Amino acid sequence: MHAYRSHTCAALTAANVGETVRLSGWVHRVRDHGGVLFIDLRDHYGVTQVLCDGDSAAFAALEKVRSEWCIRIDGTVKARDADLVNPKLPTGEIEVYVRELEVLGRAEELPLMVFGDQEYPEETRLRYRYLDLRREAMQANMTLRSDVVASMRRRMWDKGFREYQTPIITASSPEGARDFLVPSRLHPGRFYALPQAPQQFKQLIMVSGFDKYFQIAPCFRDEDPRADRSPTDFYQLDLEMSFVTQQDVFDTIAPVLAGVFEEFGGGRKVDAPQDWPQIAYADAAKWYGTDKPDLRNPIKMQDCSEHFRGSGFAIFAKLLEQEGTEIRAIPAPTGGSRKFCDRMNAFAQKEGLPGMGYIFWRDQGEGLEAAGPLAKNIGPERTEAIRQQLGLGVGDAAFFLGGKPKSFEKVAGKARDVIGAELGLTETDRFAFAWIVDFPIYERDEETGEIDFEHNPFSMPQGGMEALNGDPMAVRGYQYDLACNGYELVSGAIRNHKPEIMLKAFELAGYGADEVKARFGALFNAFHYGAPPHGGCAAGIDRIVMLLADEANIREVMMFPMNQRAEDLMMQAPSEPSSDQLMELGLRVILQD
């Protein structure tokens, strides 16, 4: 017999009754029934009930074991009495009578219990992550993650892609976040960087003549943490292809992701890839207040400025006299009660706005009546025009925000989400995907007037050099994101592979030719040697698994995540370097006040 086990703790069934077996695992739960000890023995695969009484030579030793001790038992498989069968367990028809016990590892008093559903502070869970990971939900999440990655790999290989690894230590590159710098011992005063993404390398792979690349790539970014983002590192399904259009990229990655969500989505509806809408970035902001809309929510915001221009509601009327302002309406079907309207108004105030105007419609017997402060100020003709434009009726409401769109769109998007959730409009058993396209390449700083890249600096401008010679703020890129249920899952672009267009694009953002060559020298030089048109994207594995696991926090699907302050409490990172380490690297630490 094997030194530790003949079966896993999920393998034994009624067919094994009478066999002598060996199991190893953790003591999940101990129950003393008056001289008979019952132990739920757990391993990665499942749970088996084992028992022991005073007739067994192992009884005295088994009395001493406690939760989370790691033990090995030898025993005989017995059938449970019919009234004691547990249909919820694969091993629920049997139990193992213990004849021999070996303690493989004792456990001290536990800082958190593995058994049960008790909640613990995240700090405790992360400090003792190896215990937290023993919990059933965490085991399921990590297994799901492994299965998702394996499925992605298989699907990419089936599409003719090959997996190539790119360097983990490279040069610093401005790609939208702060780099993690690594000092060089051999080159004092110089630094490597951990890659924010394999961006330049995967493009160089295309220039090298490889047609289809992918990898499960680690990425490192020094970012502020969020519930859906790690502050230090994450993994992505990274891919790139030569001789492709934007639609080719969509047609490649969409079936892969749809297949993964169908395979692991637990029966939730997955929109077919051909039904994933392509929404312009400007329209996404206008309709949903975000470039990662949750399309499970049917609410679409609309511009209602004309109904307030010159109206009796002075706040909006005067606002519209300013250039670049508008009034945006958020329809709220079934939200037509003063209580709900007041609650949403309070929500806007918590978000830092003065409030939200609202109108709700009710049946007054003789016909439809518009109610609320706005309705009183703008009159029945305007409120009726608004109602018809928004397609609302009795029992419905509409909320209004005004100003320059960038000043209120974020709050409007949040309000749309809250309205959809509270009114039961948002589907909960569906994965709704949408491509966001036509991203602006540039943005202008309102204070300085300077132009900088709004998104990926490596994307090909629509219209090429001719577009760059016109108004920079009108230039759109062959750049795209894929949103699902309010999260950005994929980001990508058709790349700018022509050196003269690359120089012009960076020039408009204030980068001189020398700086471009210094920062992106390898890529810039490679483009002088017959670079093919190419494009690709990257899908965030952590967020995908988070959605599939129905978790609200990305740390629930990462094996050893950092906390909100970018600290690893278990490994005590970041740590202070020793004086010898600093001396060897030619560094000294200067702490700023």
Curated annotation (Swiss-Prot):
GO terms for molecular function: aspartate-tRNA ligase activity; aspartate-tRNA(Asn) ligase activity; ATP binding; nucleic acid binding. Residues 199-202 are annotated as: Aspartate. It catalyses: tRNA(Asx) + L-aspartate + ATP = L-aspartyl-tRNA(Asx) + AMP + diphosphate. Keywords: Aminoacyl-tRNA synthetase, ATP-binding, Cytoplasm, Ligase, Nucleotide-binding, Protein biosynthesis. ATP binds at residues 221-223, 488, 540-543. GO terms for biological process: aspartyl-tRNA aminoacylation. L-aspartate binds at residues 175, 221, 455, 495. CDD domains: EcAspRS_like_N. Pfam families: GAD, tRNA-synt_2, tRNA_anti-codon. It is an enzyme of class 6 (ligase). Its EC number is 6.1.1.23. It is found in: Cytoplasm. Its main location: cytoplasm. The record marks 33 as: Important for tRNA non-discrimination. NCBIfam families: aspS_bact, PRK00476.1. PANTHER family: ASPARTATE--TRNA LIGASE, MITOCHONDRIAL (PTHR22594:SF5), ASPARTYL/LYSYL-TRNA SYNTHETASE (PTHR22594). Aspartyl-tRNA synthetase with relaxed tRNA specificity since it is able to aspartylate not only its cognate tRNA(Asp) but also tRNA(Asn). Reaction proceeds in two steps: L-aspartate is first activated by ATP to form Asp-AMP and then transferred to the acceptor end of tRNA(Asp/Asn). Homodimer. This is Aspartate--tRNA(Asp/Asn) ligase. It comes from Ruegeria pomeroyi (strain ATCC 700808 / DSM 15171 / DSS-3) (Silicibacter pomeroyi).
